[in-house]
């Protein structure tokens, strides 16, 4: 069944920003006494907010000063501004949604500033999405709270059960499932088991998404 609205996560779904952020985070935490592999960084932190990263890293022994979150944001923004690649195939997905007359939105735990930087590396894509960006920072709620996906649906006047979510983290997929939406778990670099465990339907190539959505 075709959805009436598709809501995408941003990092790791539209733009391949997570490797950049994870590398910066690993380097900084190692310098502050918490040496983790990139795999552990992804397992522990991906899909959350920087505030929860701060809390969890401190609990694990990182010597993080007050004000670290704001400081790290500035480091991250500067690095992302050098250029953030798109997820392969995402533009074709949006083209097919446009051809089918199906609207789409973005729901992210990241800030609007971050999305403007990462998506802004691709002006044509940013122009397609800029009026449908929903940020946890602006809404005051973050995934796994389903509100980050329910709000775009309400604004579009579309029932949750007629929507599809595309997310790459267990946290985000949990939000989609809790929202009562069909949730597609994008597992580009793993088997998708963690996404399936929270109720998502894993898939591994963005090129496969149109077929899964019945386009």
Regions found by a protein language model. Name each.
Residues 86, 107, 141:
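Residue-level marker of regulatory loop/turn positions in helix-turn-helix DNA-binding domains and
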Residues 1-4, 91, 95, 111-215:
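Asp-based, Mg2+/Mn2+-dependent phosphohydrolase catalytic module
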Residues 2-10, 14-100, 116:
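N-terminal helical cap/lid subdomain that shapes the substrate entry/recognition surface
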Residues 9, 13, 108, 168:
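Conserved G/P- and acidic residue-centered "switch" motifs that form tight phosphate/ATP-binding loops
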């Amino acid at each position: 069944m075709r959805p009436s609205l598709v809501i995408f996560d941003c990092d790791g779904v539209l733009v391949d920003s997570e490797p950049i952020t994870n590398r910066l985070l690993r380097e900084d935490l190692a310098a502050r006494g918490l040496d983790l592999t990139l795999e552990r960084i992804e397992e522990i932190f991906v899909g959350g907010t920087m505030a929860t990263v701060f809390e969890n890293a401190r609990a694990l022994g990182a010597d993080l000063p007050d004000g670290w979150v704001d400081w790290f944001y500035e480091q991250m923004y500067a690095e992302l501004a050098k250029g953030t690649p798109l997820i392969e195939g995402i533009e074709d997905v949006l083209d097919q949604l446009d051809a089918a007359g199906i609207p789409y939105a973005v729901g992210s735990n990241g800030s609007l500033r971050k999305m403007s930087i990462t998506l802004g590396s691709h002006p044509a894509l940013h122009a397609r999405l800029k009026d449908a960006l929903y940020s946890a920072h602006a809404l005051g709620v973050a995934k796994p709270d389903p509100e980050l996906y329910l709000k775009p649906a309400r604004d579009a006047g579309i029932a949750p059960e007629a929507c599809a979510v595309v997310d790459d983290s267990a946290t985000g997929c949990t939000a989609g499932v809790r929202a009562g939406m069909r949730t597609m778990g994008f597992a580009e670099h793993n088997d998708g088991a963690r996404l399936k465990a929270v109720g998502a339907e894993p898939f591994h190539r963005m090129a496969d998404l149109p077929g899964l959505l019945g386009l």
